[in-house]
Each structure stands twice: as structure tokens, then as C-alpha cells.
Regions:
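N-terminal Rossmann NAD(P)H-binding glycine-rich loop of SDR-like oxidoreductase domains
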Residues: 2-27
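SDR active-site strand-loop-helix element
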Residues: 11, 34, 66-70, 107-113
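Conserved glycine-rich Rossmann-like NAD(P)H-binding loop of the short-chain dehydrogenase/reductase
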Residues: 16, 30-40
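Rossmann-fold cofactor-recognition segment
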Residues: 36-52
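Helix C-cap/helix->beta junction micro-motif
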Residues: 61, 102-103, 149
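Catalytic helix-loop patch of NAD(P)-dependent Rossmann-fold dehydrogenases
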Residues: 87, 91-95, 115-150
């Protein structure tokens, strides 16, 4: 399914993946691209850890879809700052799910191979996660919040 003429909110859009997703969707849609680091003029400030601001922006922009790319991805930083990793990667996604459920908006959540322990050569969608790092555990928490909310 190709989305056209939709309002799409993309969080965590400041990195390489965010730029690629933004460029893909902006062609045929009205995109609000956001990040906590406004390193590009097309980025709006949104912090997924702030549920009140997520509600406010979602009520005014009225997205048809929310794509959450927001994450702390630096493995060493996450290990040294586990609370911040869980608040950003886990609670941030939980906040998005709460807003999305309240306003009836579908959500796309980007996870990581880091939810697996690396014992197998290949993993499938339904393999049992076993994250070893704080980063993997925090992203897995985000997955669980997404599953729980939908």
C-alpha cells in the first residue's frame, strides 16, 4: 500500500534513516519531521519523552500515521546511562502508543536486531527475543509497549 495525501508524523528524523524515510514520504504526503536535535531546517522539535507535547502536536497536526524513529542508539552511551535509554527508547514509544490509541492513529515502530542475543546466524520475526545490552532491552521494551497497545 502506497500512502498519498496523508498527514505523517515522523519522530527521530534527524539521522540517516530519518532522512531516507522523510524523503520517501514527503513526495506524496504532508510530513511533519521531528527530532530533539534540530540539525536541519525541515525538522521540528518533538521529544517523545514528553507526552503532553506529543498530544498537543498530534491534536493540531492530525496525523494519519506516526512513524517513530526516535531512539538512543549509541550502545556505550546506553550502557552508561540505562535510565535515559529506557526513558527514550521504551517510555518514548509507550507515550507514542498512548497518544496514538487515544487519537486512533496507526503507529510504525522501528526496532533493532539488538533484541536478539546473536546465538543464531539468522533470526525471524517470531523468534524469541533475548536482548543482552541495555540498548537491546530498552528497544524490546518499546516493542512490548507497541504490541500491548495494539
Amino acid at each position: 500500500m502506497i500512502l498519498t495525501n496523508q498527514n505523517i508524523l515522523i519522530t527521530g528524523c534527524g539521522g540517516m534513516l530519518g532522512l531516507a524515510v522523510y524523503n520517501t514520504f514527503k513526495v506524496n504526503n504532508n510530513v511533519l519531521a521531528s527530532d530533539i536535535d534540530q540539525n536541519e531546517p525541515w525538522l521540528e522539535y518533538i521529544d517523545v519523552r514528553d507526552i503532553e507535547s506529543l498530544f498537543k502536536i498530534s491534536k493540531s497536526f492530525k496525523p494519519d500515521l506516526i512513524i517513530n524513529l526516535a531512539a538512543l542508539t549509541d550502545l556505550e552511551y546506553c550502557e552508561n546511562h540505562p535510565n535515559e535509554a529506557f526513558v527514550t527508547n521504551g517510555l518514548g514509544q509507550e507515550n507514542i502508543c498512548l497518544v496514538a490509541n487515544t487519537l486512533n492513529i496507526p503507529v510504525v515502530y522501528i526496532s533493532t536486531a539488538g533484541i536478539f542475543d546473536g546465538e543464531k546466524e539468522y533470526y525471524h520475526d517470531f523468534d524469541v527475543p533475548n536482548p543482552l545490552s541495555i540498548y537491546g532491552k530498552s528497544k524490546y521494551y518499546g516493542e512490548l509497549m507497541t504490541i500491548k497497545s495494539h
